[in-house]
Amino acid sequence: MKQATKKSGIWLGKMELSELSQIANKKGPVTAPINAGTLGGPYLTKLKGRGMEFAEARSYQPGDDVRHIDWRVTARTGRTHTKLFREERERPVMLVLDLARPMFFGSRQRLKSVQAARIAALMGWRALLRGDRVGGVMYSEKMHREFKPRGDRRHFLRLLSNIISEHNRVVDEMTKGEWNFVSKFLFAEALRRVRHVVQPGSLVYIFSDFSGFNAECRKHLFQLSKHSQLEAYIISDPLEKEAPPSGRYAMSDGEATAWVNSGNSKTRQIYTSTFDEQLKKLELELRLCRVSLKMLSTVDNVSHI
């Protein structure tokens, strides 16, 4: 298949994700800075974790918190030392992007994977405007890549460039018929690795259709939520929620075409009810894991978020 032009809804382009910085700039920072005193950082205390980073060790002084005694330095020097901390001035933000095969589906305007990349880019641009450090984790059946949070624009542009290249690589493979089986453990494994790279006090965005969600994912999300703030964007396509009117419809993977019958009104009603029930169950599971969530369709305008 010949590569489509930018903003086709199938392939990702650099300009498409870069332009979202203008939307982020128009809307302004999501969280306003506050003055919390001498040690105050830019955020209220709803952030999880200590929000402090190690600065140095010095000789223990009366009144120091005994919980902060640096036992290694104490043992090495023979004198009691205590750890000094400074409050983190920037919040780490991690963008977790699902590029597994189920995300490469779309019936209108764009693929779920394209919409996920767009909202991830927008959230990243907004974080940079707030002065936060932005990193990312993206994964598919063939790759898992991690980018440590940094506060400079060039680093974020490299992250976006990697998202574009990996996304378009999968599209290219699919159009050539190079299919891979989806592992039911892919999402859980990605979240397990996220737990090891996310710093306490981070804001973690997850962009996925959550088709791979299971009990193992629930465990990892719950552990993550103890020290970080989690926000999930559940990406869906209109055709997943509601079957089209009765008739025969062509569906294609870019190479082969199949015809499906949408059935009668009762069948379509069952179809919609099944989606709604599955979504309600997922929402409950995520809320129990202390994950705030938002639904996002492939036809939604991300600039309104």
Regions found by a protein language model. Name each.
Residues 67-77:
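N-terminal low-complexity, intrinsically disordered segments
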Residues 2-43, 59-64, 73, 82-118, ...:
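Exposed, interaction-prone extracellular/peripheral surfaces
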Residues 124:
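Substrate-engagement module of ASCE P-loop NTPases
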Residues 121:
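Conserved active-site region of classical short-chain dehydrogenase/reductase
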